[in-house]
From Swiss-Prot:
A Pfam short name: tRNA-synt_2d
Catalytic reaction annotation: tRNA(Phe) + L-phenylalanine + ATP = L-phenylalanyl-tRNA(Phe) + AMP + diphosphate + H(+)
Entry protein name: Phenylalanine--tRNA ligase alpha subunit
Molecular function, one GO term: magnesium ion binding
Free-text remark on how the cofactor is bound: Binds 2 magnesium ions per tetramer.
Residues holding Mg(2+): 256
Cofactor names: Mg(2+)
This protein's encoding gene: pheS
Family in the record: Belongs to the class-II aminoacyl-tRNA synthetase family. Phe-tRNA synthetase alpha subunit type 1 subfamily.
Biological processes, Gene Ontology terms: phenylalanyl-tRNA aminoacylation
Amino acid sequence: MKERLYELKRQALEQIGQARDLKALNDVRVAYLGKKGPITEVLRGMGALPPEERPKIGALANEVREAIQQALEAKQAKLEQEEVERKLAAEAIDVTLPGRPVSLGNPHPLTRVIEEIEDLFIGMGYTVAEGPEVETDYYNFEALNLPKGHPARDMQDSFYITEEILLRTHTSPMQARTMEKHRGRGPVKIICPGKVYRRDTDDATHSHQFTQIEGLVVDRNIRMSDLKGTLREFARKLFGEGRDIRFRPSFFPFTEPSVEVDVSCFRCEGRGCGVCKGTGWIEILGAGMVHPNVLEMAGFDSKTYTGFAFGMGPERIAMLKYGIDDIRHFYQNDLRFLRQFLRV
């Protein structure tokens, strides 16, 4: 029995050494250590041996099995390492080959305009305020002097979630929230960019989701002339030197007086063209002096503090700057459109 075990060990180690791949190695493992292998047969036949020989033969059988197992593991590790080296050699990179150019992403034209507007006002000392897109009825309407029953609160114009919760219809709620945080003490000087939602039918000039940038300044002795000077500077930096603006009377519930703001046409220099519809002026935003009711509801004394506010649609400004005739282009992810705005 001893001789047989020694011979099995010799044969197994020889075949392990000759194995050229993992499959051949596994065949050796099954042949010698499997349930039907010779080592297992020896252990099963221990009962036929004289009692005094069983411990010695059992110990030898376990020793042989352990030696074969260790040889199998060592050979497997060697074969796996050789396989890794073969793959590395096959996949070697030729460092002398020219590199492939990396395609860089570019800002979306709308994002570019929003960032440009933000940078202009930050340069004037404004800070950027942010707020929730899912807003309460109070901040979206009441705090902005839009009482119950006002047409702008109609269910047909807003996306209501509950009777008191809706998707904000403008970024003005951020102004009300910011003024509240100041607890009646100025100055306040912010811009509020963000997405807004209205129940509009999507067409060339309307979208159910779009962006707004609103601005607010509250302090002592703020006048209409401050508003005009700010917006004239904004127009000149955004549309080019030589631009002028004009105010036209209008109405917004949260400002009094309220104005529509036009900029002199940057296409025809005021001579009249298709962009300005022959008038020499292009409407770009709405503005006005903050209504005393809005100041009071936010905790400011309207006899001590005054302020101005303005709001614009970056989509409209981007359409004017780049000659885009359909707002839907901004949201369709058409690469033919977007690639026209690649930065060099």
